[in-house]
């Protein structure tokens, strides 16, 4: 545990501006952002002023007390005791500093995303009727959008490890290999290279299954002439990679070649356009121009990229929250390019995805990896 008090202080300044009494941390990415580590059940409270409170099982107490440097550590001794401790500490926080004396309920923020269990959000509202629960995005998005140098280094390392997994996957592409075998070997290679885990399943799609944007693992073996889409997402110290490549086992036919050429061209065009002030909608427009030029405009899907960092999809989460398509990019953001598959229904699809840092000169790739799609049969 290495508490980032500098980040906590910046969060508290935003909390005061937005009249937020506290942030309740119940998700892995915010916990790691503030506390420098992760736990199976990440729980913490950051008040508008003063030190954070860490909530943990009794056996973890010595380690956390040392890391907290005298700050509060709330210990629970039973599974049911955890929510009681959160509620007790939260009531202490919201009762202080005059926050409870206003006409409206004190506001408590929490991340509302995939990794925050819905049942805990519902339970929290039930046992805390004297507070208003709001999203922590208006606080966390400005803090986490622009990556610090150490964050960029970890993301680049995650991308490097994804490349090791992709190398291993490519080596295995031969007639009759199964997607399960390719996924297993790629995952093993990445874990041996230093990945903690992956942020999504390991996607390996063959043949017609390459039409799916997230097809998990194809049920049938690879055959000569098949397209193969592989998408790898290792994490290093919580930071996510996203590397996708499309291969052809043997010589591509005309339509396959057109798909591959088009996608490679649109990725480069979007990368060059990825500058501060530009939106994902603008980048989608650029991608559509390229697809239309190749006669594939009707197959283009919006959502060419999304934010990425400690969470696999961060703001702008253009593929999940439509208004995010219109958020201007900011220098220093990390964004993927190549998220949607360009697929011809009943035939197959292609995509090349990497992570870039937004700069005034266009997208700066964090770790380059070849897009050569040809694999000898």
Could you say what each language-model-derived stretch is?
Residues 1-377:
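Active-site neighborhoods and metal-handling regions in enzymes and metal-associated proteins
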């Amino acid at each position: 545990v290495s508490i980032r008090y500098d980040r906590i202080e910046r969060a508290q300044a935003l909390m005061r501006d937005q009249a937020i009494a506290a942030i309740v941390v119940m998700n892995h990415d915010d916990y790691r952002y503030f506390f420098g580590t992760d736990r199976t059940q990440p729980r913490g409270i950051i008040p508008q002023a003063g030190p954070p409170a860490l909530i943990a099982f009794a056996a973890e107490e010595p380690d956390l007390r040392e890391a907290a440097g005298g700050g509060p550590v709330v210990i629970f001794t039973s599974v049911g005791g955890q929510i009681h401790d959160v509620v007790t500490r939260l009531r202490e926080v919201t009762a202080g500093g005059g926050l409870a004396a206003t006409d409206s309920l004190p506001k408590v923020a929490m991340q509302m995303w995939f990794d925050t269990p819905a049942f805990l959000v519902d339970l929290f509202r039930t046992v805390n009727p004297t507070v208003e629960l709001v999203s922590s995005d208006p606080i966390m998005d400005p803090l986490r959008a622009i990556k610090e140098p150490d964050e960029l280094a970890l993301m680049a390392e995650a991308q490097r490890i994804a490349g090791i997994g992709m190398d291993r996957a490519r080596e295995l592409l031969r007639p009759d290999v199964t997607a399960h075998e390719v996924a297993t070997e790629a995952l093993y290679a990445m874990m041996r290279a230093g990945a903690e885990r992956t942020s999504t399943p390991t996607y390996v799609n063959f043949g017609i299954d390459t039409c799916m944007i997230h097809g998990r693992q194809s049920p049938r073996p690879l055959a000569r002439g098949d397209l193969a889409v592989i998408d790898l997402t290792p994490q290093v110290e919580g930071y996510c990679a996203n590397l996708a490549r499309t291969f052809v086992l043997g010589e591509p036919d005309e339509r396959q070649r057109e798909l591959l050429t088009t996608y490679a061209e649109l990725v480069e065009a979007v990368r060059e356009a990825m500058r501060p002030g530009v939106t994902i909608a603008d980048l989608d427009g650029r991608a559509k121009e390229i697809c239309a030029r190749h006669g594939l405009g009707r197959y283009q899907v919006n959502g060419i990229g999304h934010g990425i960092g400690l969470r696999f999809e961060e703001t702008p989460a253009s593929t999940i929250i439509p208004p995010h398509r219109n958020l201007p990019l900011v220098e220093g953001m990390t964004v993927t390019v190549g998220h949607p598959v360009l697929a011809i229904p009943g035939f197959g699809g292609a995509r090349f995805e990497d992570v870039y840092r937004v700069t005034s000169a266009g997208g700066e790739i964090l770790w380059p990896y070849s897009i050569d799609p040809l694999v000898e049969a």
